[in-house]
């Protein structure tokens, strides 16, 4: 009999922190995330949109050499199912944001179906957030990709501070919620915006929630397909921020 098979319930509870007892997945409605762990660092990483394959590859490789916990959505599509509808997974971190996303993506969704989807998200949201959000002064790094439709120019009007060291490359930039992190990044050759204040509109994104809760959060945006640049910026960010 193996040692694990012979353990008592008390031993399982006492030693449940062992790596082979840690969950490998966590879900909220139809958004299921693979969990990659390396070492003991409390740093968190996130890939929230399944169609951003450049970011997926960059983050997966990064976790081979850097400590922390990464959450990578399993879906290969941008949106995920919830009940009988679909939602943008980066709009599900608040009820208001989730409702707006559900209405936009599912124009024929009736009130009972809408409420059912919202309740499904309400039941599991805090459990997911407890896993994603670091404690204390820990850091969460999100690694998305963008296209021609989105750049740092979209964030400038709603940001508290802006540093554009690469105005000719608006698709590569950092978005952060902590002024100290912003100050460090602003000294670099990269574009960065600060969004610390609670926004007037709650769009359900993780950056808005992090700002609201005072969580250190950095979003690393790079154009889809530019893996070398995203790798460079992620390694640099990990080396410069405490």
Segments predicted by a language model, with ranges:
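Secretory targeting signals
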Residues: 1-7
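Structured catalytic-domain cores with a bias toward divalent-metal coordination
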Residues: 7, 13-242
């Amino acid at each position: 009999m193996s040692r694990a098979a012979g353990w008592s319930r008390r031993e399982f509870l006492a030693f449940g922190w062992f790596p082979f007892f840690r969950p490998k997945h966590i879900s909220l409605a139809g958004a299921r995330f693979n969990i990659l762990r390396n070492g003991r660092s409390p740093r968190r990483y996130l890939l929230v949109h399944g169609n951003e394959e450049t970011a997926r590859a960059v983050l997966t490789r990064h976790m081979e050499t850097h400590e922390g916990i990464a959450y990578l959505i399993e879906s290969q599509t941008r949106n995920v199912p919830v009940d009988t509808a679909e939602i943008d997974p980066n709009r599900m971190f608040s009820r208001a944001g989730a409702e707006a996303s559900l209405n936009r993506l599912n124009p024929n969704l009736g009130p009972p179906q809408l409420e059912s989807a919202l309740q499904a998200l309400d039941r599991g949201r805090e459990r997911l957030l407890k896993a994603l959000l670091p404690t204390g002064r820990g850091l969460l790094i999100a690694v998305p990709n963008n296209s021609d439709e989105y750049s740092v120019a979209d964030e400038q009007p709603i940001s508290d501070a802006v540093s554009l060291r690469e105005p000719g490359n608006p698709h590569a930039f950092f978005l952060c919620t902590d002024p100290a992190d912003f100050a460090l990044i602003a000294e670099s050759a990269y574009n960065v915006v600060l969004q610390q204040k609670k926004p007037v509109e709650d769009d359900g994104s993780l950056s808005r929630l992090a700002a609201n809760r005072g969580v250190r959060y950095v979003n690393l945006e790079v154009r889809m397909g530019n893996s070398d640049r995203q790798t460079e910026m992620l390694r640099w960010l990990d080396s410069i921020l405490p």
